[in-house]
Structures are given as structure tokens and as C-alpha cells.
Swiss-Prot record:
Gene Ontology terms describing biological process: translation
NCBIfam families documented for this protein: L18_bact
Protein name stated in the entry: Large ribosomal subunit protein uL18
Pfam family, one: Ribosomal_L18p
Gene Ontology cellular component list: cytosolic large ribosomal subunit
Family of the protein in this entry: Belongs to the universal ribosomal protein uL18 family.
Quaternary assembly: Part of the 50S ribosomal subunit; part of the 5S rRNA/L5/L18/L25 subcomplex. Contacts the 5S and 23S rRNAs.
Sample GO molecular function, one term: 5S rRNA binding
Protein source organism: Staphylococcus carnosus (strain TM300)
Amino acid sequence: MISKIDKNKVRLKRHARVRSNLSGTAQKPRLNVYRSNKHIYAQIIDDTKGVTLVQASTQDKDFENETGSKVELSSKVGEAIAKKAADKGITEIVFDRGGYLYHGRVKALADAARENGLQF
């Protein structure tokens, strides 16, 4: 019998492997991305303190009336997180794609964040 591969389990193993070498500091915090079937979430984290500095997602009040494809909304979340980070004085980050492939919604979020001033 053929067993079905649990894609989320594989993603979590990949994410744990990457996180062992990747950490955010106060000077260069970590931009973490989580993707569900319907929404995308991004947060900038200082791992030394264990504190979320800035967050943005498609469930924020700013996105209540937004329409468009999931890729377009992801790029708008990237813009929002970059603007919120700039308000807090954060310009350099470490990008944590959360074990997802750098493609589609994750890539759109990262590109929009770069275009709006975040360096990684």
C-alpha cells in the first residue's frame, strides 16, 4: 500500500533544520512567514528576548475590504510589514521562509518587503 506523505510534517522538519542555524537579534531581527490555505502572516521577531516586534497579516483590519489573488494580498502584507518595521527603526532583517519554498506567496511577500526598504 502506498503511504501518503504529510507535507506539513516535511515542512516542519525543514523549518527546524533551517532554524538551527538562523536566529534574529535586536540589531538584525528575523522576519518569519506563516502561510495557511487562506491567509498569510508575517512577523519580525527578536529571538534573544523572544519578542515579536512587528506583525502583519491578511487578517488585520487594514485588509478587511481588500480583494485580489492570494499572491497580490501577500505582496500587500509585505508592504505593510516593511512600513511598520520602518516606523520602529528596523531596516535590516534575516528572512525565515518557515520551511516553505521561496515561490509564489512567500516570494511576493519578500519582494514587496525588499522594495519598501527592508534589507535581507
